[in-house]
Amino acid sequence: EMCIRDRSDISEKIFAPSGFMKVDADYSGKPYEDWLASDWPKTYRNPSYPNIFAVGIAFAPPHQISKPRKSPNGTLITPSPPRTGMPSGIMGKTAVLSIHSILKSGENSGIATASMSDMGAACVASAGSGLRKGSAAAMTMYPVVPDYVKYPNTGRSLDDTYGEIGLAGHWIKLLLHYMFIYKAKGRPGWFLIPE
């Protein structure tokens, strides 16, 4: 239960039934056929309490990212979008830029946006050991949340969505490891390294 000064319960304004925080998304519960990329949040602010932000796995997705299906034994399969790693970094940066703008210039000036229907993501997953043997999968996806209005056949840009398996993924993962540590330490030029 979440209360404000007058002790009134504000939980329903803050949290979805799933326990995740509500943000500027469309939570109307419409059927799959009516889902749109624009249902997804852009600012990650709670509409009732705009001084509260939720990014990454903290915010409540408005719906899954693909058609709900069932396994042969009847288990419901409801894919959710990736809300960790690269997407979380972009969302976090968006929230920080908005908070900075609010503190510096006033309530609604310069609110940053980054919808998952407009952002891409990359992932490198190691599947072995060593930099001379084994393999890794390197994938990119754009946009993270499918947009069937912009890309009618697949919901995604086929030029920007692909994957490869091979040794290069290990080298990429090693390079990213050192780049992110460099960025986290705030070394010169850190801001040029993407999320």
Briefly describe each language-model feature range.
Residues 3, 61, 132-134:
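Functionally constrained cores in energy, signaling, and assembly domains
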Residues 5-88:
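FAD-site-proximal beta/loop scaffold in flavoenzymes
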Residues 84-87, 94-195:
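C-terminal, flexible cofactor-proximal segment of oxidoreductases
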